[in-house]
Amino acid sequence: MNGTEGPDFYIPMSNQTGVVRSPFEYPQYYLAEPWQFSMLAAYMFLLIVLGFPINFLTLYVTVQHKKLRTPLNYILLNLAVADLFMVLGGFTTTLYTSLHGYFVFGPTGCNVEGFFATLGGEIALWSLVVLAIERYVVVCKPMSNFRFGENHAIMGVAFTWIMALACAAPPLVGWSRYIPEGMQCSCGIDYYTLKPEVNNESFVIYMFVVHFTIPLIIIFFCYGQLVFTVKEAAAQQQESATTQKAEKEVTRMVIIMVIAFLICWVPYASVAFYIFTHQGSNFGPIFMTIPAFFAKSSSIYNPVIYIMMNKQFRNCMLTTICCGKNPLGDDEASATASKTETSQVAPA
């Protein structure tokens, strides 16, 4: 084995030289230079400074403006809540541990940080699944009289939390475990060992199949069907031009969210899968650190995409920030063009 396994950790370095120490008790400066840990801390500080205000503002603006409280927006708000969980429950911890060069909060703190990171990522993924299904039902109309309403949105939000907890909670109760990864300053699922005492192998397989592969299959199926339907509707002019434009805008926004999710999380999932399927292989701490920390940037992109691509929300946000007056002066003019209330468009 090219790593050193302890009771609650796995360090990607052989202890033949005797320098390896517990990541819960000693700085890990033998894995990387101190300045590299400082860079991680600076990166986490940036994510906190950007991630907290923009996600909190997304929630606050929606509460302030009744016209934004549409069923589809419930799912988008769920993404903001998940991102805030990641920022407050995970990023603050990782910032502090990176400044110290090791996971100072011990195994319990590792469980907390790993839980929030996994929970936030999974809520985001399953929210995208719900959005994909919503787009499929609204645009493709497999059920002609179905309308995506408030109750459906609430059930969708509940579903995302149930599925996310089904992935993030088991390591806390003995099925797999959370351990420090990469440079040992952040925690995640143990992909590094089989650890039969906690049935680690079965959990990792379960996680990759149920909580990564299946959601992606659903997403790609829904959007594959959606592309064909939109092209066919455009060719036959089955919808009004205004309705088609609104549907396309919302669909485009959600697809970009999916692409951004894949860009952030597929590198991490790919590296984790490689490590799991190549037990004992030789890899350095940076190999997992870069994709793990890059995935954390997902807490920023969803609200940014939403603000950039939804003119109605953008105007409401400016109105809130500017104490009730939109400096651009086109709050109502843009309301029709980019409403995310397209979930309520009646079937043609």
From Swiss-Prot:
Q: Which residues lie on this side of the membrane: Extracellular?
A: 1-36, 97-110, 174-202, 275-286
Motif 'Ionic lock' involved in activated form stabilization is found at 134-136
Chain positions found as Phosphothreonine: 336, 340, 342
Instruction: Note the topology in the membrane.
Output: Multi-pass membrane protein
**GO molecular function, a single term:** metal ion binding
Q: Which Pfam families match?
A: 7tm_1, Rhodopsin_N
User: What InterPro entries does its record include?
Assistant: GPCR_opsins, GPCR_Rhodpsn, GPCR_Rhodpsn_7TM, Opsin, Retinal_BS, Rhodopsin, Rhodopsin_N
Q: List the GO terms this entry assigns under cellular component, sorted alphabetically.
A: membrane; photoreceptor disc membrane; photoreceptor inner segment membrane; photoreceptor outer segment membrane; plasma membrane
Family statement = Belongs to the G-protein coupled receptor 1 family. Opsin subfamily.
Subunit composition?
Homodimer. May form a complex composed of RHO, GRK1 and RCVRN in a Ca(2+)-dependent manner; RCVRN prevents the interaction between GRK1 and RHO. Interacts with GRK1. Interacts (phosphorylated form) with SAG. Interacts with GNAT1. Interacts with GNAT3. SAG and G-proteins compete for a common binding site. Interacts with PRCD; the interaction promotes PRCD stability. Forms a complex with ASAP1 and ARF4. Forms a complex with ASAP1, RAB11A, Rabin8/RAB3IP, ARF4 and RAB11FIP3; the complex regulates Golgi-to-cilia rhodopsin/RHO transport in photoreceptors.
Record's protein name: Rhodopsin
